[in-house]
Amino acid sequence: MSNPHRGSIALQAGDRAYTLSFSVNAICELEAELDKPVTEIIAGIQDPKQLRLSSVRALVWAALRDHHEDVTIKDAGRITTDAGIQAAVEKVGEAFRLAFPEAKGKTNPPKAAEG
């Protein structure tokens, strides 16, 4: 079930709905799977010329981990196929945006008082 306030998005794949989200643990698993830091992963998904299907599958797999822990990387590939690659990419993007909301207000945190 989708809950954008908690950072989760629904992905419909065939007759099943899956919940996607990117917690710290999910992002760590994604970094380990792709052997890249999250900043590089984000840059890669923002450039369609760099986007690989293996990365899409890994992104879907990692996004599923919080709510569907038993899903394997191959299961994630089947789910991506059933949902449609474009729909899966869009939903993963939404889940990433919820995990990394833009900072509002001040751009720098307040400095600690010296003492």
Positions of predicted regions on the chain:
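Short capping micro-motif at the N-terminus of alpha-helices
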Residues: 20-22
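Charged interaction scaffolds used for protein-protein
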Residues: 1-17, 36-51, 65-115
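Hydrophobic (often cysteine-bearing) scaffold residues that line and stabilize catalytic clefts
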Residues: 52, 56
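Short, surface-exposed, low-complexity cationic segments
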Residues: 24-41
